Amino acid sequence: MANLKRIRDRIKAVKNTRKITEAMRLVAAARVRRAQEQVMATRPFADRLAQVFYRLQTRLRLEDVDLPLLKQRPIETVGLLVVAGDRGLCGAYNANVIKRTEERVRELQETGQQVRLYLVGRKAVQYFQRRSAPIAKTYVNLSQIPTAAEAAQIGDELLSAFLSEKVDKVELIYTRFVSLISSRPVVQSLLPLDPTRLAARDDEIFNLLVRGGEFTVERSKIVAAVSAPPPDMIFEQDPVQILDALLPLYLNNQLLRALQEAAASELAARMTAMSNASDNATELIRTLGLAYNKARQAAITQEILEVVAGAEAL
């Protein structure tokens, strides 16, 4: 009987755990949807910004533009902006970002370059603090869905470090959102900006859908409307001055998109992890149920044998 009670208690505990993991899966799905809506909300601004940059490039194509954010200089120190998460229970999401960061740090150090780390997310901060890494700045407890203000704060500090020559180059390491079951850490160069890549084409957005009772994601191409700038776009000021003022805005927009992609990747990883945990809990409950039934049948059989043996003794 003690064995039966132990199995019943374990089944109850696993069922309670399954309720938690299923709730976390649904919460993550809702937040992925919110992240998707935020990406869509920022698209008109990003498209218009691309149009302005394209027109400015057209005007300045034959000029030698000398702007601080476009200036290439010998690279002695590289700043790495690493975007991880504040929480766990999201599979290998944080571990993959940290692993890619360590690989990139080794690559840079092998070429004789120094590294300064700008860390987003408590998991990355804790990991690199334990290893006495060269941490320049940390950002923790950001919003579940990144905001433009948070991206601007990070962007301003990176700009300050670059313009003051504390770093000669800034790279971004974040997890690119591919699908609910697939994501990959990527390394992207942020500073100095490349004027040939300002008007980005073939951008992508993701759409969270429900098919057959399961969540799925579709990615679709967004071609920025930069090939035909509006004819009424007239620059009253010097185009160089306008470009100089808009470059920080462009950088902040790139950071916001990266933070949004990383947040969506983390939420998708958490959805997948919690879905797998729920499935494993269901299978464990089934296995424990079979074990409980076998133990109960064995107990009943034993009781019958004892009754029969007692009757024969009389």
From Swiss-Prot:
Protein name per Swiss-Prot or TrEMBL: ATP synthase gamma chain
Annotated Gene Ontology cellular component terms: plasma membrane-derived thylakoid membrane; proton-transporting ATP synthase complex
Gene encoding the protein: atpG
GO MF: ATP binding; proton-transporting ATP synthase activity, rotational mechanism
PROSITE patterns listed in its UniProt record: ATPASE_GAMMA
One Pfam family of this chain: ATP-synt
Membrane topology designation: Peripheral membrane protein
InterPro entries cross-referenced by the UniProt entry: ATP_synth_F1_ATPase_gsu (IPR035968), ATP_synth_F1_gsu (IPR000131), ATP_synth_F1_gsu_CS (IPR023632)
Family, as annotated: Belongs to the ATPase gamma chain family.
Localization of this protein: Cellular thylakoid membrane
CDD domains to which the protein is assigned, alphabetical: F1-ATPase_gamma
